[in-house]
């Protein structure tokens, strides 16, 4: 006996659009939570200073992550996706570097070595990793344009 259709027929492009939309939402959510966490923690790090305080750098990360989240959701262009990926990759890389390596003061950047894990830092790693994966998907899995026959 033939199986009954489970719903209306779908095109391959519908699935791709859904996955890209989900990736955009995940990227924006990860970047949005990253922005919130950095803004929330900034005051605690104002005392760690050189020329620039670590709190100021946290506020800068919060602003960049918020802008990246908006670009991924609203602008939806490769350049915006690239900016979002750079913010996510850069933020995650710096967090891990300063967690595991004591690089000291770098010019105006204070010594941000912090060899401990705590809830907000763990959450930041998770949301930044989600944003990295989602934005890399957006950059690498570009939709195909019409093919010449």
Question: What does each model-found stretch correspond to?
Answer:
Residues 2-149:
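Membrane-interface extramembranous regions
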């Amino acid at each position: 006996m033939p199986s009954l259709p489970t719903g209306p027929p779908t095109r391959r492009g519908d699935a791709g659009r859904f996955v890209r939309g989900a990736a955009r939402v995940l990227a924006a959510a990860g970047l949005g939570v990253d922005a919130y966490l950095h803004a929330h923690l900034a005051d605690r790090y104002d005392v760690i200073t050189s020329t620039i305080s670590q709190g100021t750098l946290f506020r800068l990360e919060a602003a960049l992550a918020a802008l990246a989240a908006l670009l991924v959701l609203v602008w939806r262009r490769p350049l915006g996706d690239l900016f979002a990926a750079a913010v996510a990759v850069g933020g995650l890389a710096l967090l891990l570097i300063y967690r595991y390596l004591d690089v000291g003061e770098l010019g105006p950047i204070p010594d941000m070595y912090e060899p401990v894990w705590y809830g907000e830092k763990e959450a930041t790693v998770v949301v930044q990793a989600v944003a990295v994966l989602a934005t890399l998907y957006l950059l690498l899995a570009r939709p195909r344009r019409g093919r010449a026959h």
